[in-house]
Swiss-Prot record:
Coiled coil: none annotated. It comes from Maricaulis maris (strain MCS10) (Caulobacter maris). InterPro entries: ClpP, ClpP/crotonase-like_dom_sf, ClpP/TepA, ClpP_His_AS, ClpP_Ser_AS. The lineage of its organism: Bacteria, Pseudomonadati, Pseudomonadota, Alphaproteobacteria, Maricaulales. Cleaves peptides in various proteins in a process that requires ATP hydrolysis. Has a chymotrypsin-like activity. Plays a major role in the degradation of misfolded proteins. Keywords: Cytoplasm, Hydrolase, Protease, Serine protease. This is ATP-dependent Clp protease proteolytic subunit. The active site is at 106 (nucleophile), 131. Belongs to the peptidase S14 family. It catalyses: Hydrolysis of proteins to small peptides in the presence of ATP and magnesium. alpha-casein is the usual test substrate. In the absence of ATP, only oligopeptides shorter than five residues are hydrolyzed (such as succinyl-Leu-Tyr-|-NHMec, and Leu-Tyr-Leu-|-Tyr-Trp, in which cleavage of the -Tyr-|-Leu- and -Tyr-|-Trp bonds also occurs). The gene is clpP. Gene3D superfamilies: 2-enoyl-CoA Hydratase, Chain A, domain 1.
């Protein structure tokens, strides 16, 4: 049985460009990286996080004042991996805009709302899901207690991050994240997870990308 990620990588389009030195080919994601566009697609895990972090650091080194665009379509994943990306977004000097296409769930929703203020977007048919962290553990009773206490610490920290980026109170966030909470793009806007629902790119942005 084939790994879906391997199948996807084999289907990634190649872009060929003419340069003064002849033809150069890029996979589509590398070509878009040249335009300061990053994709978070699929489950968020350690390997993906290291690639996203490296791209963010590279683009900051190229131009610390220029915007980085991050497109998100993710069901979420490992909390520590997601927080690594989050911390890097806050650490670098480049402003990071975020855009949800498809789904931003769990850690995906946290990264969506972590974008630069007034630069957090969702497509009209995007779905956003927030919830509290979960985990399973086996072992001695004392180990289980420590693990449960650690999950509570993580829960509090994630709640604080949502409070910071949405402007909601801690109690509102805790209530919203108590169970899987699915929102439409408009509901995500009203909750404060994004700043705007956009259907079409602005004309001046189109012109800028063509120049």
């Amino acid at each position: 049985m084939h790994d879906p990620q391997d199948v996807m990588m084999n289907l990634v389009p190649i872009v060929v460009e003419q340069t003064s030195r002849g033809e150069r080919s890029f996979d589509i994601y590398s070509r878009l990286l040249k335009e300061r566009i990053i994709f978070i697609t699929g489950p968020i895990e350690d390997h993906m996080a290291s690639l996203i972090i490296a791209q963010l650091l590279f683009l900051e080194s190229e131009n610390p004042k220029k915007e980085i665009s991050m497109y998100i379509n993710s069901p979420g994943g490992v909390v520590s991996a997601g927080l690594g990306i989050y911390d890097t977004m806050q650490y670098i000097r480049s402003p990071v805009s975020t855009m949800c296409l498809g789904m931003a769930a769990s850690m995906g929703s946290l990264l969506l709302t972590a974008g630069e203020k007034d630069m957090r977007f969702a497509a009209p048919n995007a779905r956003i899901m927030v919830h509290q962290p979960s985990g399973g553990f086996r072992g001695q009773a004392s180990d289980i207690e420590r693990h449960a206490a650690d999950i509570q610490k993580i829960k509090r920290r994630l709640n604080e991050i949502y409070v910071h980026h949405t402007g909601r109170t801690y109690d509102e966030i805790e209530s919203a994240l108590d169970r899987d909470n699915f929102m439409s793009a408009q509901e995500g806007l009203e909750f404060g997870l994004v700043d705007k629902v956009i259907e079409r790119r602005a004309e001046d942005e189109k012109e800028g990308s063509d120049s």
